[in-house]
């Protein structure tokens, strides 16, 4: 949303107003806890608030209390035309019936990359919301 601001009789300048979430923090955490981890990488692009919440131990604790635990496997792939490897989450859809042999119940979902250099990735482990 933008609001006009007039300055000395000239054309009005447009000042952008920051949008903020109107939901209380606890409600937002509860809502995100009900969303599948498959969608977290997309949600992290929406707002900075989502990025920090998705990476927070608080969200994973809430998911655990709600019984919304999802197993996933992190996969690191290096493509020939890219200088750095890319991270994906192997998401296994539970309770899916495969209609034919061409379809697959599993998805590789892109995951935001780790900020350290690939040389330090000799051994990594994911615990809750963190990758070490």
UniProtKB/Swiss-Prot annotation:
F-box domain segment(s): 17-63
Coiled coil, from the record: none
Name of protein: Putative F-box protein At4g05620
UniProt-listed InterPro entries: F-box/kelch-repeat_ARATH, F-box_dom
Transmembrane segments: none
Organism of provenance: Arabidopsis thaliana (Mouse-ear cress)
CDD domains assigned to the protein according to its UniProt record, in alphabetical order: F-box_AtAFR-like
């Amino acid at each position: 949303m933008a609001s006009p601001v007039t300055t000395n009789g000239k054309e009005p300048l447009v000042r952008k107003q920051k949008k903020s979430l109107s939901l209380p923090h606890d409600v937002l955490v509860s809502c995100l806890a009900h969303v599948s981890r498959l969608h977290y990488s997309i949600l992290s692009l929406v707002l900075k608030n989502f990025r920090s919440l998705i990476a927070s131990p608080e969200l994973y604790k809430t998911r655990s209390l709600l019984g919304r635990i999802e197993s996933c496997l992190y996969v690191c792939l290096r493509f020939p035309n890219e200088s750095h490897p890319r991270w994906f989450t192997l998401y296994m859809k539970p309770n899916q019936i495969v209609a034919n042999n061409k379809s697959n119940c599993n998805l590789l979902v892109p995951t935001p990359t780790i900020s350290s250099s690939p040389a330090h990735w000799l051994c990594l482990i994911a615990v809750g919301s963190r990758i070490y």
